[in-house]
Each structure stands twice: as C-alpha cells, then as structure tokens.
Amino acid sequence: MRRRRIAAYAAGHSCVDVYQGAVAALVPFLVSERAYGYAAASGIVLAASLLSSVVQPLFGALADRRTVPWLIPLSTAAAGLGIALVGADAGYAATVAAVALSGLGVAAYRPAAARLVRTAADGPGHTAMSWFALGGNIGFACAPLLVVGALSVSGPAGWWLLAAPAALGVVLNLPRPGRERAAGPRAAASPGAPGHEDRRAFMRLSLVAVVRSVAFIGLSTFIALYVRERGGGGTAGALALFALFAGSAGGTLLGARLAARRGRVATVRRAYAAAAPAVLGVVCLPLPLVYVCAALAAAALYVPFSLQVTLGQDYLPTRMGTASGVTLGLTVSVGGLASPFIGALADATSVRTALLPLTVLPLLAWALARRLPEPVPGA
C-alpha cells in the first residue's frame, strides 16, 4: 500500500465529508434561528441527499470510462461553497439550493476518489479503504466543532470560515503527474479480482447499505435535537453529535482489523447484530448514557462501511467506479431521503418517538447480510 498517497486521499476525504456532517450540525441552528420546523429542517438534509443519490453512480460510471483529474478538486470546492452560501439567508429555497450544491460536490468526489484509493492499494484493499473512510469520518466528527466555531463569529465572516476546509482540500486533491494515469480506465479491475460480476450479491449488498444509511443518517440528523428535548442544551446536543461521529471513526478502523481475522462478510453481520442494542440504548436509556450508546451505535454501524465498499468493488470488479458510486455514494445518500418522514413524525409526536423505528434497522441489515457471499480472489 502506498502509504503517503493513501494518507493524502484520506486527508482530502476529511476536507470533503466535513460538509456532509455540517448539514446535520446546521439543523439545530436552522430550527432555533430561522424558525424552521423539524420537517422543514430535515428537508435541508434531503436536499443534500437527493441530488447525491441520483448523480453519484453517474460520476462513478464516468470515472470508469475516462480519467477526469479536474473532477476531484472541483467537487471539493463545490462542497465547501455550498455550505458557506447557506449563510446568505436568502430564504428557504435558496438555502435548499446551497445545500444541494454542497451535496453535488460530495457526490462527484466520492466515486472517483474511492476508485483511486483501490487502485493505489496492495492486496484486497479494505485496509486502504478503511483509512480513506476514516478520513471522511474525521471530517464528520469535526463538523459540529467547525459549525459551532464558525457561527460564533458574527456576520458573513463566520459563514465564509466554513469554506476553509474546502480550500485545503483543493490543494490536497490537485492532480499529481502519474497518479491519474496509474488509475486510468485500463486499471478498472480491482487487484486480484477475477473479473466475474455477481450482480445479485451486489444488489443485496446495496440493500444492506441503504438500511444502514437510514439508521445512521436518522441518528445524525436528530440526535442533537433529541438531546435538547431530553433537557440538554445546545452544547449537549453538539457533544452527542460529536460522540456519534467519533464513534464512527473508531468503527471504521476496527472494521479493517476484524475483517483481516474473520473475513469481511462475517464482520459485517456481527457488527449489525451489535448495533441493534446500542441504537435501542440511545432512545431508551437516561441522558448521560445516551452519549455512550451513540458512540457505540456509530462504531457498530461504521465497522461495515469500508468493508461494504470493497465488497461492492469485488462483486463488480470491472466497474469499480460504478460500484463505489453505489456503495459509498448512492446508498449512503438514500438515508437522507428518510429524514423528512422522521421529521414529520417528530413534529406530530416527539423526536424520541420518531427515532424508535430506527432501532429495528440494524436487525434488518443483519438479516439481509446473512446471504452475502465472501468473494474469493482468483476464483
């Protein structure tokens, strides 16, 4: 594994995914400062997710067919610019459009970057992909701190501070001579993959990833509001969101280690089984324990994350960009499509009641994952 290159990809991923985390971190601000209802605020999450859901596989297919070195830095800039433009406060429609621009940037970045990571990796690639995913998770975890820090600065300057990670990410993601040639269209097959496509397994894996996405994005969107509803303040809500994102970072690295010992599919199944009681604890246990359960739930839900990306690439070994666009992109973004429904239920009842359906989703993901095959290199 080319460690320096993977580290650069991971750092660049952090600078992009901080903006997907920022969308969730902005929800409490939009509710309190702009008087949005829960359903309206969750519609902001939908704006970032809906566009991503449609276009990520298209960007993945583009990356499979041709080398597009400009796409990664340009998408990084779009992700940051969109979030910064939320501060213009030109009305709900303009806010939705700004967040959609950010979502488009994230959507364009992920498939192309994930494909570069896999071609730069040695062996099965799940260790390299776990570090790449960790970079994204660090960005997620830092998002609440970035939002709180930037919005503590009065005026437009605070909002433009939100674009600082994107500026760094553009520098990190600038094309390097030889990097894109090594990962060009002729290098589409994953290392050691036989070239046989298992579309049925890929579809089942995609369903697993969708269920996981609904559970995690539902928690990340509403956990800060949930903590406030339980009597915590704004800082307590940000702490809960930080615990969730920090747990996801730990789970990503743990997934690679467990997969090396027990196999990817077995690790995915056990992680979802472990996630079920943790998500239940977030909803049912007293407030101090919510932070612990949030971290545990996120860790268990993120153990499968990078493993599902490499499984998808091995199920479709000649179309890594497309596979990444689905497993790393589309299925993750689809989780945001459920947010307005959760928000509408929260408006009608309470945030706690709205989160209750999420407790069964890890068990559903576990049941779907039971029939996933473990790819055998060279078979």
Predicted features along the sequence, with ranges:
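Helix-to-loop junctions at the C-terminal end of transmembrane segments
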Residues: 55-67, 251-263, 346-347
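A late C-terminal transmembrane helix in Major Facilitator Superfamily
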Residues: 315-349, 358
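Extracytoplasmic gate region of multi-pass secondary transporters
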Residues: 23-24, 200-243, 249-250
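C-terminal transmembrane helical hairpin of 12-TM major facilitator-type secondary transporters
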Residues: 265-308
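Helix-loop-helix hairpin linking two adjacent transmembrane segments in secondary transporters
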Residues: 132-178
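Structural signature of the two symmetry-related core transmembrane helices
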Residues: 70-84, 266-280, 359
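Cytoplasmic helix-loop-helix junction between adjacent transmembrane helices
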Residues: 98-135
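Conserved MFS/SLC helix-loop-helix module at the cytosolic interface between two early adjacent transmembrane helices
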Residues: 54-90
